[in-house]
Amino acid sequence: MSLSILIAIALFIGVFTYYLWIWSFWMRKGIKGPRGLPFFGIINAFQSYEKPWILRLGDWTKEYGPMYGFTDGVEKTLVVSDPEFVHEVFVKQFDNFYARKQNPLQGDPDKDPRIHLVTSQGHRWKRLRTLASPTFSNKSLRKIFSTVEESVAEMMRHLEKGTAGGKTIDILEYYQEFTMDIIGKIAMGQSGSMMFENPWLDKIRAIFNTRGNIIFIICGIVPFTGSIFRWFFSKVPTAQTVTSLMHTLEIALTKRVEQRAADEKAGIESSGEPQDFIDLFLDVQADTDFLEDETKNGFARSQIVKVDKHLTFDEIIGQLFVFLLAGYDTTALSLSYSSYLLARHPEIQKKLQEEVDRECPDPEVTFDQLSKLKYMECVIKETLRLYPLASIVHNRKCMKSTTVLGMKIEEGTNVQADTWTLHYDPKFWGENANEFKPERWESGDEQAVAKGAYLPFGLGPRICIGMRLAYMEEKMLLAQILKKYSLETTFETHIPLKLVGIATTAPTNVHLKLKPRHSD
C-alpha cells in the first residue's frame, strides 16, 4: 500500500474521529438533547424557514427539560431556560462569556476590518461599543428626530391612500417600507423618501426570507471554507446581497468623506447639526483609553495600549451595515405585532388612544412627548414579551472555562437562552402568561421580573444598542396612527399569526383594517 494511500486513510480517520468526538460531546457529559447526525448535528434545523428554529427550542425544552445540549457542525451549544443561569452567563460572568456564537461566513471577529457590534468580541467589541454608544444617546436621537418625523408623515399619507374605502392592507409591508425609509436616510445617504420605490427593500427582505442557505451549512461544518466564500464574494459583490449592500454603504460613506474634505478645503463650515448616522459616526471621538488584550489573561485583566479613538472607514461601514439590517427588520416586526395585538384587544387600544389624545393633543408629536406615553411603553414591552424578535443572538460563547451554578462550562461552548420559553413561563409571569396584559408593566418596577426572564433586547453589557431608536420610531408612528385610526382585524387576518423565519421570527403577513376615528 502506497504512502499516499496510508496518509489519506489516516487523515480520514483523524477527521472522522474529530467530528465524532464533537457530535458525542453532550452524550459523554450525560446531558440530553437532540442529536442529529455526525458531522452535521442539527445544523439543518437552523435553515428551516417554515418552522423557525428558535421556536423548536421550546419544543425541545418540553422534551428534554430546562437544560439540554446539541451540536451543529463543529459548534457545541447548551440551551437553558433557567433565568438565574441566563443572568449568571449574560451579566455576572460576562468576562468569561463576552463573545457570541457565529458562523465562519460572518468573518473573523478579531481580524475582519468591517466587523460590527453584533459579531465583534473582547476589547474590539468594547472599543466599538464605546465609540458607537453616543450615536444612540437622547442627544443624538434628537438630531435625527426630524428625519424620522418626515418618514412618519410620508407613511401616514401612504396609509391613508392604501386604506381608502375600508380596504384591508398587509400592515407588515407598510411598516417595512417605513423602517427601510428611515434606515436609508440615516445610514445609506439616501435623500428624500423612497417608500414603495426603494430598489433595496426586496433584496433586504430576501436576506431575512432566504430558505436553507447551503453556504451557511457548509461553513458551519467546515469552518475554513468561510474565508474562501468571503474572498469570492469580495471579488464578485453581486453574487451575495450582503456584500452588495456593503459596497453601497462604501459608496455613500466615500461621498460623504469627500464632500467633507472639499468643504473644509474651501473653508465652508458645516450647515448645522449632523442629520444621519454617517455624520454621527464620522464625528464620534472617545475621551477614554481602551484596553487591548494580547494574551489570554481574561477580558477584565489587560494592559492599556494606544488605540485609535475614532472609528475607521471600514468600521463605520460595518456599523452602518448591522444597523441597516437590525433597524429595518426588528422595528417593522415590533410595529406589526403591536398593531395586531391592539386590533385583537380593542379595550387596550382604546386606553392607549386616550393616552395619545391626552399627551399629544397637537397634530405633531414632539420628542419630549414620547417619554410621556407610559402606557404605550407598557404595550410595546408586553408585545416584545409575547413576540421576542431576534432571539437567535441571545447566546454567549464561553471564552474561558468556568463553572456556572455548579455546572462546568468548557471554553468554546455556546450558551443559548430559550427566550420564548422564558417569556411564557407561568412561574415568572403568572397563570395569564399567554395573555396580552400591558398592565403587568404599569408599576414601573421591572425588578419584580425575575432577572434573566425577560430578554426583548438581550441582557447585560451586550444589550441592543439601538433600543432607544427603536422605541422612538415605534412610538412616533403608533401615536400618529392611533390619533387618526382604530386598528381592526378582518376575515383575512391570521389568528393566530403564522410565524416563519430564520434570523428573526416574523409573521407571514398581518392583514388589518384601519378605521378612521373621525369623519372629515
Curated annotation (Swiss-Prot):
GO molecular function: heme binding; iron ion binding; monooxygenase activity; oxidoreductase activity, acting on paired donors, with incorporation or reduction of molecular oxygen
Membership in a protein family: Belongs to the cytochrome P450 family.
UniProt xrefs under InterPro entries: Cyt_P450, Cyt_P450_CS, Cyt_P450_E_grp-I, Cyt_P450_sf, Cytochrome_P450_3A
Enzyme Commission number: 1.14.-.-
Gene3D superfamilies documented for this protein: Cytochrome P450
Pfam families: p450
Superkingdom of the organism of origin: Eukaryota
UniProt-annotated binding residues for heme: 464
Function: Cytochromes P450 are a group of heme-thiolate monooxygenases. They oxidize a variety of structurally unrelated compounds, including steroids, fatty acids, and xenobiotics.
CDD domains: CYP3A-like
Protein name, UniProt field: Putative cytochrome P450 CYP13A3
